[in-house]
């Protein structure tokens, strides 16, 4: 009858409206979820690929006294725990003083007795050399190549730049609010990470290039840097030298 037909029609219209609302809700939910996923992805990608280079670039606004402060904080604690070879330290310092290392600040050298094949530069201009890497050298050219390489890390502030990259989020937030002292404090709190930093390929190639120029400028055999690489590789056949964890040796570096 007419009454039943009208009621049936009203029910159909109502259900259709409910169905439309449900579809719209689902569509909005999918849009919101998709946007949230895209936003999260953008944040993650920015943190990985955008913030570290920005943090590295921001180091330029920090005075080099920051490098000295961070280096001193690490060195004061580190040296207490090491067996310093005072005689070799004096000889190495004397040898280095006679070289043109293009250094932007005074360079100080310390030799420590260690079976680990390693050498590393601190941002304050202090270069630590392990006795094991010295024992493996056959010519002065290799030593000049090593010192030139490490001096380049100091000159280009590589360790401070890498530390800033590793702490990019905290570091940039401080600088964003013009809190330079806060940024410096963050670096200082993490000064002990300096020893464990792994330089980027770009920094290593930059240091290799400058090390080669230093060899030539001081009238040493440029092949000294090749022999240095060969020594590191020969040690790698016995065990992975500590220096390779912070100075990755690549085929491209050897070829260049």
Residue ranges of model-derived segments:
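A Zn2+-metalloprotease active-site environment signal
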Residues: 3-256
């Amino acid at each position: 009858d007419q009454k039943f037909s009208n009621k049936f029609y009203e029910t159909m219209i109502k259900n259709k409206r409910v169905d439309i609302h449900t579809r719209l809700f689902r569509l909005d939910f999918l849009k919101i979820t998709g946007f949230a996923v895209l936003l999260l992805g953008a944040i993650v990608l920015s943190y990985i690929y955008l913030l570290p280079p920005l943090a590295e670039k921001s180091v330029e606004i920090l005075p080099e006294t920051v490098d000295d402060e961070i280096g001193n904080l690490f060195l004061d604690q580190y040296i207490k725990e090491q067996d310093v070879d005072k005689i070799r330290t004096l000889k190495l310092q004397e040898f280095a003083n006679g070289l043109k290392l293009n250094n932007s600040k005074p360079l100080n050298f310390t030799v420590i007795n260690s079976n680990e094949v390693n050498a590393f530069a601190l941002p304050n201009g202090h270069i630590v050399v392990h006795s094991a890497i010295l024992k493996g050298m056959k010519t002065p050219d290799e030593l000049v190549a090593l010192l030139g390489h490490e001096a380049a890390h100091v000159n280009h502030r590589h360790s401070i730049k890498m530390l800033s990259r590793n702490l990019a989020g905290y570091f940039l937030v401080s600088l964003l609010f013009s809190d330079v002292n806060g940024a410096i404090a963050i670096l200082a709190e993490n000064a002990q990470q300096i020893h464990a930093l792994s330089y980027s390929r770009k920094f290593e190639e930059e240091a290799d290039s400058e090390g080669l120029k230093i060899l030539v400028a001081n009238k040493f055999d440029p092949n000294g840097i090749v022999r240095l690489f060969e020594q590191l590789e020969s040690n790698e056949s016995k065990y992975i030298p500590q220096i390779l964890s912070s100075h990755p040796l690549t085929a491209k570096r050897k070829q260049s």
